[in-house]
Amino acid sequence: MVIANSVKSSTTNYVVADISLSDFGRKEIKIAETEMPGLMALRDKYQSEKPLKGAKIAGSLHMTIQTAVLIETLVDLGAEVKWASCNIFSTQDHAAAAIADQGISVYAKKGETLDEYWQYTHCILDWGADSPNMILDDGGDATGLLILGSKAEKDLSVLDNPGNEEEIALFNSIKYKLETDSDFYSRIKSNIIGVTEETTTGVARLYQLQKQNALPFPAINVNDSVTKSKFDNLYGCRESLVDSIKRATDVMIAGKVALVMGFGDVGKGSAQSLRGLGAIVKVAEVDPICALQAAMEGFSVVTLDDVVEDIDIFVTATGNYQVITNKNLVKMKDEAIVCNIGHFDNEIDVASLKDYPWENIKPQVDHITLPSGNKIILLAEGRLVNLGCATGHPSFVMSNSFTNQVLAQIELFNKSEKYAKEVYVLPKHLDEMVARLHLDKIGAKLTKLTEEQADYINVSVEGPYKPELYRY
């Protein structure tokens, strides 16, 4: 298994689509830095201290312009980094080129094959005679690869029955690695201090491992920091969903009937996004609390089966499996748009469409003819639409998320003795600090409590202002 299109030197290995795009990438990174005050403040605060000196971070997260600012912040704070994207379509090639041009190992290009994806994930874990000691994950693929690979070292039969194309590529990549390095996964796993996880789906995987007493190292759940989930997931999706649909299709959203499946933070932002452009938005939910929230926001709460033939735009935002199945797909109206804004590609049963005629319109936009003769427009092959068909969330909201990531890496790397093999969240005072770092940029001024007021509600003048279980 050879890495194609790579350049190897004494300082770096990288795989990018076109290294000549680095100047373009650098220009956009400079603009993004002006919109990412949290990360820039951490550079100023910690640059001389270098709290990540000695950290060797294997990063698996969308290789975008905003992620480039995160990577360079980690490096400024002393870390060594190897990076891959956590999605085959989400890389911005000029961002990857700009990072590679700085001598940082990056393995990412837009439109990777599944085989390439798992090759590149192996690359961030393979440091030759050395080893990474931290993981920064988005969706849990880097963590999951180490765990599954360690199991395969002991019993190769765990790789015998792949369930889909993704697992075929994953299992083959592990078999290939074990042919030349029989204890690679367990060796690397034993050197990992901990992982910081970015997204809802990856966090769910971590909690499942914790429940099974199978978590191999401590983990910090960055996703459930308030300044991540209530900003990135909500406000980020509110802007990036319609951006991606319009870039992909040029469709008029006003007047269209849209169905958002899932009304968590991502679903809430998605529903607001579509309604903001004049769509008639309906919501499908399994959780009665979220369903009631949707109804109170003025959305019709329906089931997919009841409305499937009437919907113009389908958006899945559940983090679940086979939310839209073949029996739903074949009933869709002509030119219905189908997309997913959850992390993985299995919310929509795309595999069941493979036997139907496909016409590629442009990258990540496919026309599929159903048995009825109707055609549907599938975006990003059912993968993350906002990164497959657009450039993801705006820089400012990603500054919130990535500031949390940097703080989590600093915390776990420097205070590993405090943490058992469990899943943790960042403390409230750090959440509030992240928010403070972003207020000046938008001209927001905080009111300050008096000592008497603080005493009256039993908090410190400087915070934290809410109990840990407060629901924002």
UniProtKB/Swiss-Prot annotation:
Pathway membership, UniProt = Amino-acid biosynthesis; L-homocysteine biosynthesis; L-homocysteine from S-adenosyl-L-homocysteine: step 1/1
| Enzyme Commission identifier(s) | 3.13.2.1
| Keyword annotations from UniProtKB, A to Z | Cytoplasm, Hydrolase, NAD, One-carbon metabolism
Q: What GO MF annotations does this protein's record show? A: adenosylhomocysteinase activity
Q: Which domain of life is it from?
A: Bacteria
Its GO biological process annotations read:
L-homocysteine biosynthetic process; one-carbon metabolic process; S-adenosylmethionine cycle
Residues recorded as binding NAD(+), renumbered to this chain, are 199-201, 233, 262-267, 285, 320, 341-343, 386
Annotated Gene Ontology cellular components are: cytosol
- Residues noted as binding substrate in the record, renumbered to the chain: 64, 138, 198, 228, 232
Which compartments is it annotated to reside in?
A: Cytoplasm
Write down the chemical reaction(s) this protein catalyses: S-adenosyl-L-homocysteine + H2O = L-homocysteine + adenosine
Q: Does the keyword Cell membrane apply?
A: no
Tell me its cofactors.
Answer: NAD(+)
Kindly indicate whether the keyword Hydrolase belongs to this entry: yes
Please share the entry's free-text remark on the cofactor: Binds 1 NAD(+) per subunit.
Report the record's disulfide bonds: none
Question: What family is this?
Answer: Belongs to the adenosylhomocysteinase family.
Please give the HAMAP family that the UniProt record associates with this protein.
Answer: AdoHcyase (MF_00563)
**PANTHER family on file:** ADENOSYLHOMOCYSTEINASE (PTHR23420:SF0)
Q: What is the recorded function of this protein according to its Swiss-Prot or TrEMBL entry?
A: May play a key role in the regulation of the intracellular concentration of adenosylhomocysteine.
Q: What is this protein called?
A: Adenosylhomocysteinase
